[in-house]
UniProtKB/Swiss-Prot annotation:
The chain crosses the membrane at residues 148-168, 177-197, 358-378, 637-657, 673-693, 778-798, 968-988, 997-1017, 1401-1421, 1432-1452, 1547-1567. One of its GO terms (cellular component) is plasma membrane. It is an enzyme of class 7 (translocase). It comes from the Bacteria. This is Probable cation-transporting ATPase I. InterPro entries: ATPase_P-typ_cation-transptr_C, ATPase_P-typ_cyto_dom_N, ATPase_P-typ_P_site, ATPase_P-typ_TM_dom_sf, ATPase_P-typ_transduc_dom_A_sf, HAD-like_sf, HAD_sf, P_typ_ATPase. Mg(2+) binds at residues 1340, 1344. One of its GO terms (molecular function) is metal ion binding. Belongs to the cation transport ATPase (P-type) (TC 3.A.3) family. It catalyses: ATP + H2O = ADP + phosphate + H(+). Its main location: membrane. It holds the Pfam family E1-E2_ATPase. It comes from Mycobacterium tuberculosis (strain CDC 1551 / Oshkosh). Its EC number is 7.2.2.-.
Length: 1625
């Protein structure tokens, strides 16, 4: 489709530029002719634009005419035309509400026109959509349609109720204005550039920069833009501003600004062209007469103009200035969208910059600077970078989305992504393509709930019903009888239907039917969590299982419009993801889409078209996932653009003040047209494009189906998965350039360089991450400012410090990642994949899979959905799988559930809502007993274990020490900048030159920036991380070490963390034992040993080197073997086993038949659950003895023990050595048993657990135990670990009914939590944090991963721990000794103290430098007493090496083991040392540190000022005086540093070395002169040392007097001596 005028413009502009170049400098007339040549095609192009402006202006000033005026004679304008499809705008002809109710009167006559194939009215668009016949003359047919519509509209108008129009034309991406407006602006930029080049070549005089300043004032003043929009409309305003700017740039011969704007407009043109192409491709399906017509939702957009008439401009939206609306008149009250009314980071800065530039211009005029200076101030404050950064990001992102087929109706929505604070996900968008049974109920015998479910599910999927079990009935002739449909609901529906299951005419059950969840629902929610926005889910039927994945939920039927409106009012801009289905109330959905700041709708071809959406995606959620991925990137891109704009404005202002801007007279100078503002804009443009490209390069999400496999019959599961009907994981696409590079890297010449190149690339990426620090822009601007005022050396220093810090941090990051990769590189797990023969039917293939003997050993990573795997004890399950065969199967799922005991598994389906899902195996669980075959249903990111880490909303990692240092920097920087301003002001008062005064002020401000802070934080954390790694704690995130120093609450997962997750025998009690005997007897007692011997005889013995069949067998046999003299290492040497019956959950016991010796009487020995064994026993007094037995069992259970009863009887039958026959015989004979006693088993606590808990409690730390075990077990374990015996146990059920406030209050007082889910673990940690606690979470399972991430410090336990837990952890314990936790806490304290003292040195020294410089400037000769190079010297000698030495040195001196006579004494000293450190005051970077900084700054300034004053009062030059002040400035700081770490050899050596370097520099003539100093004599050195000693003595000997004099409280709660003594313990 052609766009009117585009070819003309392109050709004309190209010819005009060529003529301009050829014209050269021949004469002004030629240049003028060339400019005219350039401008003529632009004027030709602006016809449609001018028409739009005239219409908008006419509406604004009320020229539209009377509302009662008939549109007779008007013809409907063609709004869009492509091929045989034409859109006619009906709004001008039918200017009254509810006109679309007369749509049939328009459609019928048009359909009768020859050449018209189809015609229908899209009420939401206000358009008549016509499709012409292939052989029709399109021009004639269009004219006839316009005539017919005009006549029909006149009749409707006369019969209709005329009122004020409240609708406006729909603007689609096919509107020519979408391209014409940015193309017009680009052409104007080319004209301006041509005029500029012509002026340069012809040496024509340029207009003053006041011209450009006036254009900038109009273009970048929000109030001015709003005023113009209210008069000209957005299109007119955009064109007027573009013309004004282009004219100003051409007259002033400025090339940089139009060039940048041309690049920006080119991006907008390419974006609009891409959207236009997608509109052309998708319009036939979206505007199809076969789709239901959407209700017309009247919308009023209050953004921009004052008029309350609904309005929209596509062209303005393409520039990000308008919101998309669709209007009509079917309901009474219009909805005010207010899209874009909440300012984002760019808008906030633009307003600030507008006010600031006006103030700066006014100040320049008041100071007598003239109009040129005022114009320079305005131009310096232009926020061009802020605008262009966001525009570039949105344009590239929009073009990328269009290239994947996504229809962007409002490009302005992409410009609003940076301000989204709430993500609302409508459950309707999560609906998959297939129906699903959500609830089943059986109503007849032989039809239980599970049977009804599987039959109904098979019917929904068009499958044959599975064969019934023996106790079930066949499903021959089964069908679903649906309840009468109610039609689309008037209120939001929940997507639920009811049906009866009918078999042979009889209703045997009923089902509730909804929809499967979209496979991309989980990736969508996971991505939403990573955006940092609040995630809200409105449920529909079937999405309840996703509740734990969001911040808040709302039940089905909640009005979406009301929800979005309330969230936007309470929390900020909202992004809505929804879909319009035919069984939902589309009015509510369309209205919600209209008011959402960003409305994303999935396209359901069976439902109404969501015209009110800003973006219409495809039928799945993959594109919505990418849009959500763009949110944090958009926010970061806008913030980066704002920072660049601030930096450009700062540097431009500095150039203006120093007069550097006027030095370049050549108009074609690169420095002139690429000024700081334009340089910042160019950087923001490239950065925005790169950020958008990063989003588009993200791999497509992997689908994660949430089918209820556990509730389906194995045959159904096998047919769906092994039959290939389920999609496999999406393979990530590899860009072509990456494939080419990979191919080249394997060439013989390049192969040796592959490794180093990869390492350098990784280092570059890591370094770039380190540079993403808020201090980096500040330091970069400071370096540029130093270069501007001539201090290139200082600029290089700051840049060098930034680079060294980033590289150091990058190296540390790579080291940590490499160590973590080495630790986490799990051994390539091998698994037996069953080779299934190729047979005809699914049922036969399933039987073959169950019984096939051929297997192939493959890597677990190669498994795919549908593979059948073979598993046996003690193998680890490699993927989520549905059981096909389960023989005596028990599985340890403690890593996922927290339950320490194995769980039984079965093949039969379980209820769809059954939380145990006994027919499933989950990745990471361990086969404890039995054998299994299962079909893989999920691998990789789709497994339950992997989802555990991202299953909880709003989980964020704690801020590190960098964040606190940035906060401190934000407090200190204003003071240092004020010091620089004070130096400049004082110098001006002393009549110094403006340039010199500004140079001194900049030098002080830049020198006072604590550029060493990032390096101090990095190296201190690196040192602490290395020390901890050497002790067995791998630090994956060094930034969290700082939180270790503040941790006051440690939360422990029990199973696998404090315990070994291995059963052990705790006690063995004879049956005659008292009911509540306490303490329990030792197993070495003779009666207990007999019970243990009997239990061992009943246990299944390992055969042929195989493992134990059951965990209880292993524990009992191990305990029996430990009884010296009673049992041998392999069992009872006198016991001869005749037959064994292994434990099965269906039996509830294990049994063995044997005899003692060769002549002994055969005996039947049993052990099992008391509820199974006791009823089979012979009791003397059944009532009393049974009650006594139950009391004993209850008492043992209350101790947290798993209880087994042991019994025996004589065996009179023979054995067949056939397991099944013997099992049946035993079960028949196992009555009238003799009860021998009971065995109590429990999880084995780690040997280091109790000492750790006791040490933490002794160090006044709060310990919280969190477990999934029963409350009785939890209480018993807590007592064993050293927690108070009366500790109350709170269950997850109790937590579930509490609100956040009650939750926090309860969590603050409790120490033991039992039966908690993974989500509740996160809630417990969050509640503790709300109470002000600094938390650490220690765990090893996937169910701990989210809580580990939530805690301030996450600690994972290695070994058998889950990879999810280790991946979420900040610190990983690499061995079984939990005592290293104490070392970690001590290291955290030490690091905090080191950082605190290093920050005091850095910032306090800078404060002293500022104070000294201000005093010297005020009382000196108007010059700062120290210059830029001298401040450089101070930073080198006092800030860098001494501060770093302090940062990496522990404040607390550890005891030396060699000083103690015995190991016990050394261990005692270590314990006392740890306790002394941990119970001491918590180091802080808050108010106490600020007081230390002020004190150090005052002492430093006092010493330097005293030496400087002595120099002034003694004979000598001014340079000598300045040198004395500089020397005392350094010496005073070094002396205070020595006081801070006088026990550290490293600090002493560094301080003395720095002092020696200073003396050498001062006394060496050439070097001294280079730094602006002079060698000092004896008198001068005496004055320096006296001043240094006096100031240092005041700091050390009279801290209280110093504090009261300065006016602050001394921060140190203890003097260093006390700290050292305590530390030494």
């Amino acid at each position: 489709m052609k766009i009117p005028g585009v070819a003309t413009v392109l050709g004309g502009v190209t010819n005009g530029v060529a003529q301009t170049v050829r014209a050269g400098a021949r004469l002004p007339g030629s240049a003028a002719a060339a400019v005219q040549t350039l401008a003529s095609p632009v004027l030709e192009l602006t016809g449609p634009v001018v028409q739009s402006v005239v219409q908008t202006t006419g509406r604004a000033i009320g020229v539209r005419g009377s509302h009662n005026e008939s549109p007779d004679g008007m013809t409907p304008p063609v709004r869009w035309r492509s091929g045989r499809r034409v859109h006619f705008d009906l709004d001008p002809l039918l200017p009254f509400p509810r006109w679309h109710e007369h749509a049939a009167m328009v459609e019928e006559p048009v359909r009768r026109i020859p050449g018209v194939a189809e015609a229908h009215v899209e009420g939401s668009l206000g358009r008549l959509v016509v499709e012409l016949e292939p052989d029709a003359d399109s021009d004639i047919a269009v004219d006839e349609v316009r005539d017919v519509v005009s006549a029909v509209a006149a009749d409707i108008f006369l019969a209709g109720s005329v009122s004020s129009p409240n609708s406006a034309p729909f603007a689609d991406p096919g509107n020519p204005l979408a391209i014409l407006v940015p193309l017009t602006a680009a052409a104007m930029d080319l004209v301006a550039m041509g005029a500029t080049v012509t002026g340069w070549v012809a040496r024509l005089p340029a207009a003053p920069q006041t011209t450009r300043a006036l254009a900038a004032l109009i273009n970048h003043q929000p109030r001015m833009v709003s005023l113009m929009e209210s008069r000209l409309g957005r299109v007119g305003t955009d064109i007027a501003l573009a013309a004004t700017t282009a004219a100003a740039n051409g007259l002033t011969q400025s090339l940089g600004t139009p060039l940048l704007d041309l690049v920006q407009r080119s991006l907008q043109i390419s974006e609009a062209a891409a959207h236009r192409r997608v509109w052309r491709d998708r319009e036939p399906a979206l505007a199809s007469p076969r789709r239901p017509q959407a209700p017309v939702v009247p919308i009023i957009s209050s953004a921009g103009a004052k008029s309350q008439e609904p309005r929209h401009s596509w062209a303005a939206a393409a520039a990000g200035e308008a919101s998309h609306v669709v209007v009509g008149g079917s309901i009474d009250a219009a909805i005010d969208t207010a899209k874009g009314s909440r300012a984002g980071p760019v808008e906030q800065y633009v307003n600030q910059a507008a006010n600031g530039s006006l103030i700066a211009a006014a100040s320049a005029l008041v100071a007598g600077g003239g109009t040129e200076d005022a114009a320079g101030a305005i131009l310096a404050g232009v926020p061009r970078a802020a605008h262009m950064g966001r525009q570039a990001f949105a344009a590239v992102l929009g073009r990328g989305l269009a290239n994947t087929g996504q229809l962007v109706l409002d490009p302005g929505a992409l410009r609003r992504l940076d301000r989204v604070r709430v993500v609302v996900i409508d459950g309707a968008a999560l609906r998959g393509d297939n129906r699903a049974v959500l609830h089943a109920q059986g109503d007849e015998p032989g039809w239980d709930d599970d049977r009804v479910y599987e039959v109904a599910d098979a019917l929904l999927h068009g499958e044959q019903a599975p064969e019934p079990d023996p106790d079930e009935l066949p499903a021959t002739g089964a069908r679903l009888r649906w309840a009468p449909a109610q039609g689309p609901s008037a209120t939001p529906a929940q997507g639920l239907e009811h049906a009866d299951l009918v078999v042979d005419g009889q209703c045997v059950g009923s089902v509730d039917v909804g929809w499967e969840v979209d496979p991309y629902a989980i990736p969508l929610l996971q991505t939403a969590h990573r955006t940092g926005a609040r995630v809200v889910l409105r449920h529909v039927a079937g999405t309840e299982d996703l509740s734990a994945s969001v911040g808040s939920t709302h039940p089905p039927g909640t009005p979406l419009l009301k929800l979005v409106r309330e969230l936007r009012a309470d929390r900020g801009p909202v992004l809505l993801i929804t879909a319009v289905h035919r069984d939902f109330a589309s009015t509510d959905t369309l209205a919600a889409l209209a008011i959402a700041d960003v409305g994303v709708a999935l396209d359901d071809p069976r439902g109404a078209t969501p015209w009110t959406a800003d973006l219409i995606t495809g039928t799945d959620l993959a594109a919505a996932v990418r849009i959500l991925s763009a949110l944090p990137v958009a926010r970061a891109a806008s913030e980066s653009a704002v920072h660049l704009a601030q930096g450009g404005t700062t540097l431009a202002g500095l150039l203006l003040v120093t007069g550097e801007q006027d030095k370049t007279t050549n108009p074609a100078s690169f420095r002139r047209w690429l000024n700081p503002v334009n340089a910042a804009a160019a950087t923001a443009l490239v950065s925005g494009m790169w950020s958008a490209a990063k989003v588009l390069r993200m791999p497509d999400p992997t689908p994660q189906p949430l089918t209820a496999w556990h509730a389906l019959d194995p045959e159904i599961v096998y047919s769906r998965l092994a039959g290939g009907s389920r999609p496999l994981a999406v393979e990530p696409g590899i860009p072509a350039w990456r494939r080419i590079l990979d191919d080249l890297s394997y060439e013989p010449v390049m192969a040796p360089l592959r490794g180093p190149a990869r390492t350098l690339a990784q280092l570059a990426v890591a370094t770039r991450h380190e540079l993403a620090d808020p201090l980096t822009p500040i330091l970069a601007v400071g370096a540029a400012a130093s270069a501007i005022v001539g201090s290139n050396i200082d600029a290089l220093l700051v840049a060098g410090v930034m680079t060294v810090n980033a590289i150091t941090g990058g190296v540390q990051r790579l080291r940590a990642e490499a160590a973590a990769a080495e630790l986490f590189a799990e051994q390539d797990q091998l698994v037996r994949r069953v080779v299934v023969p190729a047979v005809a039917t699914t049922r036969r293939r399933l039987e073959a899979a169950r019984h096939a003997t051929r297997t192939a050993t493959v890597s677990a990573k190669s498994l795919r959905v549908g593979d059948v795997i073979d598993l046996a004890a003690p193998e680890v399950v490699p993927a989520d799988a549905r059981l096909l065969v389960a023989e005596d199967l028990e599985v340890d799922e403690s890593f996922l559930t927290g339950e320490s005991l194995p769980v039984d598994k079965q093949v039969d389906p379980v209820a769809v809502n059954d939380p145990d899902r006994a027919s499933m195996l989950f990745e990471g669980s361990t086969i404890v007993a039995g054998h299994a075959r299962a079909i893989v249903v999920a691998t990789g990111v789709g497994t339950a274990a992997h989802r555990a880490i991202s299953a909880v909303a709003d989980v964020e990692t704690a801020a590190g020490v960098q964040a606190r240092l940035r906060e401190l920097t934000s407090k200190v920087l204003p003071m240092t900048l004020a010091g620089g301003a004070a130096v400049t002001a004082l110098a001006l008062l002393r009549r110094a030159s403006l340039r010199q005064a500004v140079a001194d002020g900049v030098a002080i401000a830049v020198a006072a920036v604590p550029e060493g802070l990032p390096l101090v934080a990095t190296l201190s954390q690196l040192a602490a991380a290395q020390r901890l790694t050497a002790r067995g704690a791998l630090v994956r995130s060094p930034r969290t070490i700082e939180a270790l120093g503040r941790v006051d609450t440690i939360c422990f997962d029990k199973t696998g963390t404090l315990t070994e997750n291995r059963l052990r025998v705790v006690c063995a009690l004879p049956s005659s034992t008292a009911a509540e005997r306490d303490p329990l007897p030792q197993t070495t007692d003779a009666p207990s040993a007999e019970v243990l011997r009997a239990a061992a005889r009943a246990s299944t013995q390992p055969h042929n080197g195989e493992g134990h069949a059951h965990a209880t067998d292993e524990a009992i046999l191990a305990a029996a073997s430990a009884l010296a003299g009673s049992l041998s290492s392999q069992g009872d040497s006198e016991w001869v086993v005749l037959a064994e019956v292994p434990f099965e959950s269906s039996r509830g016991y294990a049994a063995a038949i044997g005899r003692v010796g060769t002549d002994g009487i055969p005996m039947l020995m049993l052990k099992g659950a008391p509820e199974t064994i006791l009823p089979r026993c012979r009791l003397a007094d059944p009532g009393v003895d049974h009650e006594h037995a139950e009391s004993v069992v209850r008492h043992l259970a209350e101790q947290g023990l798993r209880v087994l009863a042991v019994a025996q009887r004589t065996w009179d039958n023979g054995t067949t050595h056939d397991d099944e026959t013997d099992a049946d015989a035993v079960d028949a004979v196992a009555h009238d048993l003799e009860l021998i006693g009971y065995v109590g088993l429990a999880d084995t606590a780690r040997s280091s657990s109790r000492p750790l808990i006791e040490a933490l409690l002794d160090a006044e730390r709060n310990v919280v135990l969190i477990t999934g075990d029963h409350p009785i077990t939890a209480r018993a374990i807590a007592r064993q670990l050293g927690l108070p015996a009366d500790a109350r146990v709170v269950t997850g059920a109790e937590l579930a009914v509490l609100d956040e406030e009650a939750h926090a209050k309860l969590a603050a007082d409790m120490q033991v939590f039992a039966r908690v889910s993974p989500e509740q673990k996160v809630q417990i940690v969050a509640a503790l944090q709300r109470c002000g606690r600094v938390t650490a979470m220690v765990g090893d399972g996937a169910n701990d991963a989210a809580a580990i991430r939530m805690a301030d410090v996450g600690i994972g336990v290695s070994g058998r721990g889950s990879s999810a837990a280790r991946g979420a952890a900040d610190i990983v314990l690499t061995d079984d000794d939990l005592g290293v936790l104490l070392d970690a806490l001590v290291e955290g304290r030490s690091m905090w103290a080191g950082v605190r003292d290093a920050v005091t040195i850095l910032v306090g020294g800078n404060v002293g430098e500022v104070l000294f410089t201000v005093i010297g400037t005020a009382f000196g000769a108007g010059r700062a007493p120290v210059g830029t190079r001298q401040l450089l010297l101070v930073n080198l000698l006092t800030d860098m090496f001494p501060a770093l030495a302090v940062a990496v040195t522990s404040q607390f001196a550890e005891p030396d083991d060699a000083e103690y006579p015995t190991d016990d004494a050394a261990e005692r000293a270590q314990r006392e040392h740890r306790r002394a450190v941990l119970i001491g005051p918590t180091p802080s970077l808050d108010a106490p540190l600020l007081r230390q900084i002020v004190n150090r700054g005052v002492v430093t300034a006092a010493g330097a000022t005293a030496a400087w004053a002595i120099g002034r009062w003694t004979p000598g030059t001014e340079r000598r005086t300045a040198t004395m002040g500089l020397t005392a400035l350094v010496m005073t700081q070094l002396a205070q540093t020595l006081l801070t770490r006088r026990h550290s050899p490293l600090v002493i050596a560094t301080a003395l070395g720095s002092a020696g370097v200073l003396v050498g520099i001062i006394q060496t003539p050439v070097i001294s002169h280079f730094f602006g100093c002079t060698p000092l004599g004896p008198v001068a050195w005496t004055g320096v040392f006296s001043a240094t000693a006096g100031a240092t003595a005041v700091s050390a000997l009279a801290p209280k007097w110093l504090a009261s004099t300065v006016g602050v409280v001394q921060p140190d709660e203890r003097p260093d001596d006390a700290e050292d003594s305590d530390a030494g313990g």
